[in-house]
Amino acid sequence: IKFERTSVMNLENAIRGARNPMNSWGRMDSAYDEDGNYILGPNDLDLAKRLRRAGSDHRKYVRQIFVSVDITAPLYWWKEYDTYKVATVANSTSTMHKIHSRPFSIDDFSHDHMTPETLAFMETVVGRLEAIRLKYMEEGKNKEDWYDMIQLLPSSYNQMRTCTMNYETLINIYYARKAHKLEEWHSFCRWIESLPYAKELIVAAEE
């Protein structure tokens, strides 16, 4: 699994909104650094941490912190990710429309945990897929050949999606998946931990 082009947005507006109930905007002490990163001041960070720990009714502001990221992952992982439908959007590369557009190679598939015997068999599957693809391209794009590719395609095939989500969704994912048996979820949780103020606003680890 690979994470690229991560962007965290709207932190300033989310923190300002968190102060609306108490009209305490005068206590805001955050600012942008020279690189354009929004740095929370002590007052704002203290408020954000207290609201985060007070429960979902009090931490509405975390739903207003948005994240965009390009994730490349195998189809078997996307099947699990797709259970998170609330406050997530994803635009994916099209398997149906573009599967034939370039040669198949073993690196199109997640195979890092395969035994040597299974990897050798996987090479024959990839070879068969490429033979079907060439037949499809050279013999008039017959639907039978297209179906052969689609139905033979292993769930380890890697797909890239541009995903958007918010910090509340990431709280739910982090605590539901951090002990999952799939290594991809452990990588996902480490990516979450790398986000700005993830320790305080998502993981909310005790000091």
What label would you give each PLM region?
Residues 1-207:
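Family-specific signature for flavin-dependent thymidylate synthase
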